[in-house]
């Protein structure tokens, strides 16, 4: 039986990106960080669940920090220098994720809050009784 051939490098294309958009979705249960180029094509993404946090630990600010560091590490290796940040959601990880991006050394053009707010749209779910 022949031995399997070891792959020397990954099949993933090496891209050089100078400017991109970092989108942070901070929900009450998880924090998802997606990085796109200016056309909207996804370059990399990371989330608290994908970084190994399970259950209620996903909703912590520390999990959001690790997920953001994971995404930014990939960006810097691909040569990104400038970024725009769009934050949506009311979760506990939104401030920590933004702090982590500021410490990373990327030049931020703007930080925008794009949390969707209803103008009295759908009826909300009933209140929880615990």
Swiss-Prot record:
PANTHER family: 40S RIBOSOMAL PROTEIN S14/30S RIBOSOMAL PROTEIN S11. SUPFAM superfamilies: Translational machinery components. The keyword Repeat does not apply. HAMAP family: Ribosomal_uS11. Part of the 30S ribosomal subunit. Pfam families: Ribosomal_S11. GO terms for cellular component: chloroplast; ribonucleoprotein complex; ribosome. Its main location: plastid. Belongs to the universal ribosomal protein uS11 family. The keyword Ribosomal protein applies. One of its GO terms (molecular function) is structural constituent of ribosome. It is found in: Plastid, Chloroplast. It comes from Psilotum nudum. This is Small ribosomal subunit protein uS11c. GO terms for biological process: translation. It comes from the Eukaryota. Keywords: Chloroplast, Plastid, Ribonucleoprotein, Ribosomal protein, RNA-binding, rRNA-binding. Coiled coil: none annotated. PROSITE patterns: RIBOSOMAL_S11 (PS00054).
